[in-house]
């Protein structure tokens, strides 16, 4: 029976309660064993501290070890506090980068998927001011190929993928920036030469997400974190799932944070965690 690992996240957050609710929901597929990793006694709901951050990190490290050394099929990660982790010396911007390193992956990407939208990110956890410096054709090629592979794995034989511009109006032919002409368009041409999916763009960012949500495209490649996540969370907040693409084994997580302010109050919705576990089972 395939084993799906679930890390508790920061035990001072809503991770423990949404995992309990998901496992009790009756909405998970049969034929899998679910193994929860983490020490819930290390945190008091709503009161994050170094001990709760340490417990979150210990759970991640144990999950990575099990993925490397056992037949565990996939991991679903509970929400962590990036700030809390960095205070105890965690050297990565987020869990995506942690698993890339821990599982010795060479090319990974971050994708979020919900009922209305699937969005891949060309850049991830960097300051907005750094995006123009860090955006290059290789980023776009990489996430484009990974996103096409993800869609095919989910049964879409000929994916249609829209690639966003970076600037307002997708640069308006150079009037508002040159990244579209110099970086994004060449990457789209390379992706189409690879023949793995139909890539179009650079699209005007403010319009393309509506088209994608209505089914014109199977996914959108966004140039930076909030460009992709604002429309996704507006439409799919309760059911969106974060997926790390390119790992040797699937990793998913809910698309929300620790929600320390409501932890322990019994009001956190488990929908995104349920969706994350279901997707991990599909991909395993």
Predicted segments, located by residue:
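Contiguous, glycine/small-aliphatic-enriched amphipathic segments in soluble metabolic enzymes
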Residues: 1-97, 134-223, 227-252, 256-258, ...
């Amino acid at each position: 029976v395939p084993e799906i690992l679930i890390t508790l996240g920061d035990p001072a957050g809503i991770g423990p309660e949404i995992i309990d609710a998901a496992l009790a929901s009756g909405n998970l597929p049969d034929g899998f064993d679910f193994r929860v990793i983490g020490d819930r006694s290390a945190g008091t709901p709503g009161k994050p501290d170094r001990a709760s951050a340490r417990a979150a990190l210990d759970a991640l490290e144990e999950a990575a070890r099990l993925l490397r050394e056992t037949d565990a099929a996939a991991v679903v990660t509970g929400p962590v506090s990036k700030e809390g982790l960095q205070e105890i010396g965690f050297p990565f911007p987020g869990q995506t980068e942690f698993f890339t390193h821990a599982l010795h992956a060479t090319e990974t990407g971050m994708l979020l998927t919900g009922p209305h939208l699937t969005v891949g990110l060309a850049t991830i956890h960097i300051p907005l001011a750094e995006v123009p410096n860090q955006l290059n054709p290789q980023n776009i090629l990489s996430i484009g190929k990974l996103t096409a592979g993800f869609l095919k794995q989910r049964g879409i034989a000929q994916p249609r993928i829209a690639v966003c511009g970076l600037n307002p109006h997708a640069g308006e032919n150079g009037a508002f920036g040159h990244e579209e002409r110099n970086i994004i368009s060449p990457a789209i041409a390379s992706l189409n030469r690879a023949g793995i999916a139909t890539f179009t763009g650079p699209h005007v960012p403010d319009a393309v997400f509506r088209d994608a949500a209505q089914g014109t495209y199977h996914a959108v490649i966004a140039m930076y974190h909030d460009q992709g996540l604002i429309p996704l969370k507006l439409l799919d907040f309760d059911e969106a799932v974060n997926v790390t693409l390119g790992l040797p084994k699937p990793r998913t997580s809910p698309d929300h944070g620790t929600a320390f302010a409501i932890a322990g109050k019994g009001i956190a919705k488990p929908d995104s965690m349920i969706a994350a576990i279901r997707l991990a089972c599909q991909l395993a």
